[in-house]
Amino acid sequence: MTGQLIQYGRHRQRRSYARINEVLELPNLIEIQTASYQWFLDEGLREMFQDISPIQDFTGNLVLEFIDYSLGEPKYPVDESKERDVTFAAPLRVKVRLINKETGEVKEQEVFMGDFPLMTETGTFIINGAERVIVSQLVRSPSVYYSQKLDKNGKKGFTATVIPNRGAWLELETDAKDIVYVRIDRTRKIPVTVLLRALGFGSDQEIVDLLGENEYLRNTLEKDNTDSTDKALLEIYERLRPGEPPTVENAKSLLESRFFDPKRYDLANVGRYKINKKLHIKNRLFNQRLAEKLVDPETGEVLAEEGTLLDRRTLDKLIPHLEKNVGFRTARTSGGVLEESDVEIQSVKIYVADDYEGERVISVISNGMVERDVKHIAPADIIASISYFFNLLHGVGDTDDIDHLGNRRLRSVGELLQNQFRIGLSRMERVVRERMSIQDPNVITPQALINIRPVIASIKEFFGSSQLSQFMDQTNPLAELTHKRRLSALGPGGLTRERAGMEVRDVHYSHYGRMCPIETPEGPNIGLINTLSSYAKVNEFGFMETPYRRVDPETGKVTSRIDYLTADEEDNYVVAQANAKLNDDGSFVDDNIIARFRGENTVVPCDRVDYMDVSPKQVVSAATSCIPFLENDDSNRALMGANMQRQAVPLLVPEAPLVGTGMEHVSAKDSGAAVVSKYAGIVERVTAKEIWVRRIEEVDGKETKGDLDKYKLQKFVRSNQGTSYNQRPIVREGDRIEKREILADGPSMEMGEMALGRNVLVAFMTWDGYNYEDAIILSERLVKDDVYTSIHIEEYESDARDTKLGPEEITRDIPNVGEDALRNLDERGIIRIGAEVKDGDILVGKVTPKGVTELTAEERLLHAIFGEKAREVRDTSLRAPHGGDGIVLDVKIFNREDGDELPPGVNQLVRVYIVQKRKINQGDKMAGRHGNKGVISRILPEEDMPFLPDGTPVDIMLNPLGVPSRMNIGQVLELHLGMAARKLGIHVASPVFDGASEEDVWGTLEEAGMARDGKTILYDGRTGEPFDNRVSVGIMYMIKLAHMVDDKLHARSTGPYSLVTQQPLGGKAQFGGQRFGEMEVWALEAYGAAYTLQEILTVKSDDVVGRVKTYEAIVKGENVPEPGVPESFKVLIKELQSLGMDVKMLSSNEEEIEMRELDDEEDQTSEKLNLNLETNESQL
């Protein structure tokens, strides 16, 4: 027997074929959401209030300071928030201090700043009763980027861009004449020396002294028309504010506010970190020769002589001195924006090769490591980035790859919320300033100054309508988990589908261990929406990190120390793969090892290896790592497999896969669909609706009983996608449980493991051509035994409003409706729970007042005799739609009188939940986990299905032609291993990239007493004869997908029509008709089917009068009358007339035909028939 037994949770043991030991447990898979939101509550909010505080009025007399904030208790718990359609939120209160400097008076007050949405424990938000997820956004990191470009003559040039978090961009570029230009905030370009002069380096000599002599600078100075600071300032002002009269003072303040005002320009922590890293002097000194002596200014010690080659070892010795004080000098400005001040920079001279002179000296300038808390761009940054640009022109330094994950970062929930909150606060700040100047400073209070509307509005807007705030995909727990770990490059400040090219979408070597190379949607979003890899974490700057095992450089042994590396840190190391063979002491078995260095796979000696992968599955995401034998599948099909698992419908009786990967337990636990214990303890009570756990606490080494935790279970709740969300306990009374153990299974879970489908007996064979083109043949057993039966819950809503003619009423007393239609309604007119409903049945009886009409003399007489007051009401009851039959699961009633919060104008709201049990059906879509999908074409009786020698009929027949061209061989290996596992009565785990080998599969088949090739003789169920060849038969895990035929089947006789063209609407949602398009018309024309064609273009479509009369004729059994003129023709003529054309319609004998509108007689016809020919609003 190969493999070892591993316990997954309390209830499941699997035989694992993994050869690599797990050295690191998987992190909590929804940490990306919860940790980010926690940061926002603890630090993000405080940062925001510090940024905005203090707010001063224009005179400086009044000062408003934000001191502290606190979050109260939410009004309703999570479940109740969903039920009441409200937001799960807590009140945010801020302590504010108002200081009047004239009188010295200080007022403190606590101000309510609105209800702030809270994150649930499972990483979601409840907004207006709907569960939503905030997707993390992948954006370019603020930094300075250098790239190479070729001009139209093929000449090499460079561009540089300084990108802030918010503020003006600064771009450098060269032209064909080797002049360096700068663009400020996408305006017209000016020579870069103009910007330097404006900063305060007025003369040519000052600029040359600052940057060092070189020909590019000389060319730029010659092109520069300005020769002083003032002229340079005016030149820039004219470019930035064309048309305004330029003055030196205005120009100074404009540049000052554009770049050096922290409120207008923000690099954020990450921008400062990246700029300091990029412009650090050590990056450009590596492998260069010094052109000057490096001396320690404090001790006078010579650290390196002129001409020293700075290799890795020499540079490592120099770095501590370079970071302290070596090479620092002060550049003095003589005016300009910086007035007369000192700019601290660091400069070292080196030799570079030159075509003409052999070699020359250039200056390498860094920004002198500007302090981390300077969030705007510093003058030293501008000088150093220009110096780097000149160095690149001389071949020193590196360009950047913008698709590298070192240059792309994540904005998670916390940061997205912070940015939105900042917008609201800045709007509020403006209002506060205005109110300060208007109101009397002696009687004013902080409460009167602050208007919280803009803050509340910006938060509501973000949660309600931002592209990144999405309705949670709750089809099954895996869909839920993946949605929370999704990374989107779209959204505000990101890319758009149309602009994104191939490079951005492509897999990059830096994705390794950070972003899954498999899981991404097919279609226009491919590569723009990704998923976090299973072990990846996000660091404080928003860069993705992946864990590696450290290799001890002294001994060359792999240690148990784990380091999390970002993509650009990893570029400096050689990393071995997780499957490199190790001795017991951690040393490598082989002398030469396959390793990665900067995206290249190379063979290196083992003493050069710095790190080793933690696990083979760190490359892929949670959903992808649920596919066994992933290593045997083509990546395109694996992509479909990963995506289709998310569309699996939760079944009535879920079953965990016989052939799993070991990830089923982890993903089920972290998805949020299971009930997980918060503390260790003992189970005291278990019912279908709740589980009680008594905590066990250790005090002085002794165990004592603590508090009682009560966990509520969800029973048959409707998920966001209309599937059934049901939890079942899997622990018993008296069980001792650990912290974070699964207490109850959620939907699509069995015994604490993800269970999206069922293990069924599959044969790869054809059957009378019914599985042509990936179609699937099913056995009737799967229908009879409810193997693929799923439960679907639909919600219907009806409200009683106040109308101009009086209030609507929910009642059992409905006009023109027989007692039979009311049999299931209670005395209030609402359907009873448990009633069976067919489409068209009344769910909620409701009447709406009609306009009062003038009565005729006869009617008045009758009313006078019988005393009956005319009840002028319309029947507006809620009825079950087509395909909406089922059983009433629950009814919820909300009344304004009972204190329920309802929208304005609504007095009563009734919600009816109808549950459907859907068996598997022809036309449903099914799939395996390897991208092998198909539609059910035929359900055969059990007796017709081919059977095994022992008489067992197979459950499913798949087409063998679906395998070779698709190259997803994993399904065949799964089939054989599944059969062996069924025979042995075990569950197996075959982890991705470290699973069962072919030998393991054949060995397990032999162990189970089967043929080594896994093939069997099959007998035809119809004749009892054996088939000619032996067939691959085994157990495959097949799932039923959310594309069900019941949702797609649709038929219409009459229904709503479009208002303008009077043609039937389209689509099932509108109860529309089938489009008979241009090409279909050609088909009928080709056959000369004139009457059919006339019928389709008139009475079946938009001949308003004709269709009413045709309906009448059919009802009375008379001949169908002659069709009239289609409405769309009348619309066309009206359009032509509106263009000023005189269009008339002539008959064949040149007589003009009058275009009549509907006359009274025709009106009465439609009234008599009482047909609903208008747009039916309830169906829209």
UniProtKB/Swiss-Prot annotation:
Biased composition annotated in UniProt, kind: Acidic residues: 1154-1164
A Pfam family it matches: RNA_pol_Rpb2_45
Keyword match Nucleotidyltransferase: yes
SS bonds (residue pairs): none
EC number(s) recorded for this UniProt protein: 2.7.7.6
GO CC aspect terms: DNA-directed RNA polymerase complex
Ranges for region Disordered: 1154-1180
Free-text function comment from the UniProt entry: DNA-dependent RNA polymerase catalyzes the transcription of DNA into RNA using the four ribonucleoside triphosphates as substrates.
Complex formation: The RNAP catalytic core consists of 2 alpha, 1 beta, 1 beta' and 1 omega subunit. When a sigma factor is associated with the core the holoenzyme is formed, which can initiate transcription.
Protein name in UniProt: DNA-directed RNA polymerase subunit beta
Species whose genome carries this gene: Shouchella clausii (strain KSM-K16) (Alkalihalobacillus clausii)
